[in-house]
Amino acid sequence: MEGERKNNKRWYFTREQLENSPSRRFGVDPDKELSYRQQAANLLQDMGQRLNVSQLTINTAIVYMHRFYMIQSFTQFPGNSVAPAALFLAAKVEEQPKKLEHVIKVAHTCLHPQESLPDTRSEAYLQQVQDLVILESIILQTLGFELTIDHPHTHVVKCTQLVRASKDLAQTSYFMATNSLHLTTFSLQYTPPVVACVCIHLACKWSNWEIPVSTDGKHWWEYVDATVTLELLDELTHEFLQILEKTPNRLKRIWNWRACEAAKKTKADDRGTDEKTSEQTILNMISQSSSDTTIAGLMSMSTSTTSAVPSLPVSEESSSNLTSVEMLPGKRWLSSQPSFKLEPTQGHRTSENLALTGVDHSLPQDGSNAFISQKQNSKSVPSAKVSLKEYRAKHAEELAAQKRQLENMEANVKSQYAYAAQNLLSHHDSHSSVILKMPIEGSENPERPFLEKADKTALKMRIPVAGGDKAASSKPEEIKMRIKVHAAADKHNSVEDSVTKSREHKEKHKTHPSNHHHHHNHHSHKHSHSQLPVGTGNKRPGDPKHSSQTSNLAHKTYSLSSSFSSSSSTRKRGPSEETGGAVFDHPAKIAKSTKSSSLNFSFPSLPTMAQMPGHSSDTSGLSFSQPSCKTRVPHSKLDKGPTGANGHNTTQTIDYQDTVNMLHSLLSAQGVQPTQPTAFEFVRPYSDYLNPRAGGISSRSGNTDKPRPPPLPSEPPPPLPPLPK
């Protein structure tokens, strides 16, 4: 470590060495040499921003340039040639390498903005490439391959955090650290901690801020560098002000396009966040006001102070110089960079890109009001040096008012967005009942057209979220029905309830003749239609419709897709009021019915079956007439697509077209039903029906409701037809 310090001392020179630099020996005027250095630094800043490299890379290239011209002369190596090579080298050192072609094109654009870019295949371009590579090698050899640079910005950040300086003071100090690299040769004379102390001291004088002495009785600069004294700070501050006064305004224009782009991007990312946008606007105003008047205030200080006077009051005469100095808008100054969080351990690599608007300090309020009030008071009353406590007490009310305003703005924005989000969630969560009106044919005159009785025979279907209501009673012309949408947790309970209701309903209508079977079948359909395969899967009894369903299963005319349509959707189907003859008279209408969600089993009335699982079936009571066997073909087609509520095609009203389309998208796909995870929960025992004898499950026919075993079958069941495709 000690050897490294001794080696680094070779790049710090005395005043005599600076006055005897190679350029001076070749006859270059001292002011001219300083101007050449400033112009080269300005070119590096411009090129770095166009190449989109970090401020750290630009500052490193500037230090390379300063050190290079302590060994070489401007007469042998012009600054416009060395600057691109220095930036090309610094970009690689700071791990932001740029293509050689890009560096040459950017340098050409900065030096010759009116000319077109050179052709990459031309002799002039190839010569520039060769010259830049040679200059890079010369810079490396001149610097002795010592490429690691320590910048004062790191120490500025640490010190401002140590003394808990305001944002305004930290921002100005950071800005002066960058100016020290661009405009002075402090990087060749003093170590980075000393330069950082000078920048902070200069910012304190300009802001009329005095950093108090610590509890140990030490000044703040003693914690940064023990070799720094107050006399040295005053001397270097005066020298800095003199250099600023002599520097042309065009060299003070330190552009920072990256900061502007980052600020625009930050505003674009704050989508509708009014509080953040207004806060960014306030910070931009602070940055612009401070950066616009920094150099002017410092130059006015230099006219009214001497190096022996530590306190520099800004008089009315000096403040009038603000109008005589040509200043650039604040967006071109480094201090207008967006706010970021700085960590001391990140060092200069992070802090170079910032303007210290986000430095942690004890004042949560912005220092803009303090700065503006000082600027206004300086025109009327000469400001004196005040302590930190007095300064805070003086501006406590203004800072508190500003903080309250920002808090109110933030609260308003949050409340607005919370209200909007709550309304959006409540809109999605609210499930009002949807009434579906679908005209159907009455049972009295099935041949009458739909349009004549659409107003009288409308089927109203109410779809609430929380089901459980009992179905409304059937009317001859209008049927009101609640379709229950089951949640995942309520499926099994609803299955048990519906099966129990179907058992009671079956006992109630047990004595009705078979020619009226379909009317009562669909009347009980309101209780158990969504659990048709469930009753068979759970081996529980159902109404007479279950016997016809299981007969279809035994003959494999009950397709799997129809069970999916009845179980996966978990919705109740619409009832029907047709007689048994209506189905047999219109098999063609049944085959092409695809407009509703109910399955119509139109077999003749069959006796009930035994209710105990595992008993053998009694098929002697099964008397399949010839018409019923003929209707199996349309029913096998019917299973491929759902039918209407009464077995015929149904029309839809335009009022609830969207809801009907949603139901159709779930229930009708011409036999191709969407598979859902819960679909297989209700048809789990379906494989048992593939072999009725082995599975012990019969076609469920019997003539009693008691749990006694039925008689043995007199003949085996008919052969099984092939499964539908």
From Swiss-Prot:
Give residue numbers for the modification (Phosphoserine).
116, 339, 387, 494, 498, 563, 576
Q: Could you tell me at which residue positions the Glycyl lysine isopeptide (Lys-Gly) (interchain with G-Cter in SUMO2) crosslink is annotated in this chain?
A: 341, 414, 480
Composition bias, Basic residues: 506-529
**Region described as Disordered: spans on this chain:** 359-383, 486-598, 610-652, 691-725
An example Gene Ontology CC term for this record: cyclin/CDK positive transcription elongation factor complex
Where found in the cell? Answer: Nucleus
Q: Which UniProt keywords apply?
A: Acetylation, ADP-ribosylation, Cell cycle, Cell division, Coiled coil, Cyclin, Host-virus interaction, Isopeptide bond, Nucleus, Phosphoprotein, Transcription, Transcription regulation, Ubl conjugation
Bias-annotated ranges (Pro residues): 709-725
Could you tell me where the Basic and acidic residues compositional bias lies? 486-505
Q: Where in this protein does the record say N6-acetyllysine is found?
A: 389
Note the SUPFAM superfamilies from the entry.
Cyclin-like
According to the record, the residues making up region (Histidine-rich domain (HRD)) are 479-549
Which residues are connected by disulfide bridges in this protein? Answer: none
- Which residue stretches does the UniProt record annotate as biased composition, category Low complexity? 559-569
The UniProt entry's coiled-coil ranges are 383-424
Q: Where is this site: Essential for interacting with SIV Tat?
A: 260
* Pfam families documented for this protein: Cyclin_N, CycT2-like_C
Chain positions with N6-(ADP-ribosyl)lysine modification = 484
- Give the family, as the similarity comment puts it: Belongs to the cyclin family. Cyclin C subfamily.
Q: What does this protein do?
A: Regulatory subunit of the cyclin-dependent kinase pair (CDK9/cyclin-T1) complex, also called positive transcription elongation factor B (P-TEFb), which facilitates the transition from abortive to productive elongation by phosphorylating the CTD (C-terminal domain) of the large subunit of RNA polymerase II (RNA Pol II). Required to activate the protein kinase activity of CDK9: acts by mediating formation of liquid-liquid phase separation (LLPS) that enhances binding of P-TEFb to the CTD of RNA Pol II.
Put simply, this protein is called Cyclin-T1
Q: What is the lineage of its organism?
A: Eukaryota, Metazoa, Chordata, Craniata, Vertebrata
Report which gene this protein is encoded by: CCNT1
